[in-house]
């Protein structure tokens, strides 16, 4: 059934002139009222999803971010196929989603392998940003890992029209933890939600290759430092829920220190 167009609305927000790190960071995420899309998915989620997700009383009523925009919402990690569950829900038009894909890919690459990652840009002019942001294209991509179960879903294309859908379990989780429908929605290691701790302004004027070079540089500038700091925080969150594997990643002193900050 055609879910109909996605109506886009936004949080009133102020983009800080200095887009540095903070524990709460810049909260703004694009809000999408998914019209028939989320409504239809929510109906489909009734049934087996509840037993998979489990009790919801562990979700805090207040949003307090433990570190770098990452907050624990479940004490016991939610598992899919025996592995800690990670879910990225975004939209191709969304500048915050475009910015979040960089640390997400860097962190997840430490636990498995992406295949088919493409390149794309967010939509220029969205959410007050008069520029587009180069980023990864998750639509043609897949991910395999011996430690994690990961799914990426882009629910809207560059024009805000429906693209990919969530399955029942994903919809139940999304609607429960993110009832306003804000994207990017990033559920990490079956236990955490993560928000972007820096502004998309940080990526302004950079090409895809320039951002990739910054992220992989041994002496990164402010852009690479911000992305890598979030990648490390996501890595630590994953390590706390997957048995600290692989040891070559989770045993690194910097990651160990972050794990202690995120421990329940």
What does each model-identified segment do?
Residues 33-85, 99, 106-109, 113-264:
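Non-globular targeting/processing and membrane-anchoring segments
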Residues 8-9, 17, 134:
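Intrinsically disordered, low-complexity segments enriched in small/polar residues
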Residues 15-44:
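Sec-dependent bacterial lipoprotein signal peptides
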Residues 85-91:
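Short glycine-rich or small-residue beta-strand-to-loop segments that form or flank ligand, phosphate
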Residues 2, 10-11, 21:
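Intrinsic-disorder-associated, low-complexity terminal segments enriched in Asp/Asn/His/Tyr and depleted
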């Amino acid at each position: 059934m055609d879910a109909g167009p996605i109506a886009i609305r936004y949080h009133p927000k102020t983009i800080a002139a200095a887009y540095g790190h903070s524990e709460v960071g810049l909260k703004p995420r694009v809000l999408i009222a998914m019209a028939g899309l989320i409504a239809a998915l929510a109906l489909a989620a009734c049934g087996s999803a509840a037993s998979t997700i489990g009790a919801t009383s562990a979700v805090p009523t207040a949003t307090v971010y433990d570190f770098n925009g990452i907050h624990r919402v479940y004490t016991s990690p939610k598992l899919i196929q025996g592995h800690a569950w990670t879910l990225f829900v975004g939209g191709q038009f969304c500048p915050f989603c475009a910015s979040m894909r960089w640390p997400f890919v860097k962190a997840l690459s430490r636990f498995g392998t992406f295949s088919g990652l493409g390149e794309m840009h967010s939509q220029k002019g969205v959410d007050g940003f008069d520029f587009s942001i180069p980023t990864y294209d998750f639509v043609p991509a897949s991910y395999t890992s011996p430690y994690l179960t990961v799914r990426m879903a882009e629910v809207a294309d560059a024009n805000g029209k429906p693209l990919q859908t969530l399955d029942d379990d994903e919809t139940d989780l999304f609607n429960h933890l993110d009832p306003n429908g804000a994207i990017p929605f990033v559920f990490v290691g079956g236990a955490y939600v993560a928000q972007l701790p820096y502004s998309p302004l940080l990526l302004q004027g950079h090409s895809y290759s320039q951002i990739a070079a910054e992220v992989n540089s041994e002496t990164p500038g402010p852009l690479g430092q911000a992305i890598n700091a979030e990648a490390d925080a996501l890595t630590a969150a994953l390590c706390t829920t997957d048995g600290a594997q692989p040891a070559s990643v989770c045993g690194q002193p910097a990651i160990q220190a972050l794990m202690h900050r995120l421990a329940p």
